[in-house]
Amino acid sequence: MKILVTGAGGLLGSTILSLFKDTYHIVGYTRNDLDVVDYKEVQKKISFENPDIIIHGAANTNAEECEGNKNLAYNVNAIGTENIVNAVLQNNKNIVLVYLSSTGIYGAGKNSPYTEYDPVSPTTVHHKSKLEGEKVVQNLNKYLIIRTGWLFGGGVKH
């Protein structure tokens, strides 16, 4: 089984690479290796790698930067995700896409755990752009959306 990870330079992407490197054939792309906003580049790399699973973690997670530059947030988080989805559809419909989203799409917090049936009401540009990414991912037959909260570890200061 071959796994391709986008966002491999991030906290979660690098951890996934480290955890699975001895078990699976896993390839990671950082933002320097793959510009998800460039559809031709995305299509070419997915076609070349021909993975069974794509774990799509490439995103702009800097909330302040997203608020200050809505286009940048949407380009990476929504259009970049759309490019991944379209490349999957063009290359191999059997690829499973795992999309790393955010619990922030729910909006204001609540006192009990969220479920996939809870209504979404994102309040920030970052979370709105992640929700747009989720909508695109749902055009695939084989996908998993993981909505993470705050992530800690890996020597990264928060």
Locations of regions flagged by a protein language model:
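SDR active-site strand-loop-helix element
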Residues: T6, Y29, I54-A58, L97-T103, ...
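NAD(P)-cofactor binding segment of oxidoreductase domains
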Residues: I53-I54, G68-V98, L131-E134
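Conserved catalytic-core motifs of eukaryotic protein kinase domains, centered on the activation segment
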Residues: E64-N71, A108-S112, V156-K157
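Adenosine-cofactor binding site in Rossmann-like domains, unifying the SAM/SAH pocket
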Residues: H25-K44
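Rossmann-fold NAD(P)-dependent oxidoreductase module
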Residues: T15, L19, A87, V136
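NAD(P)H-binding glycine-rich loop region in Rossmannoid oxidoreductase-like domains
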Residues: Y39-V76
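Catalytic helix-loop patch of NAD(P)-dependent Rossmann-fold dehydrogenases
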Residues: N75, G80, G104-I146, W150-G153
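N-terminal Rossmann NAD(P)H-binding glycine-rich loop of SDR-like oxidoreductase domains
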Residues: K2-K21
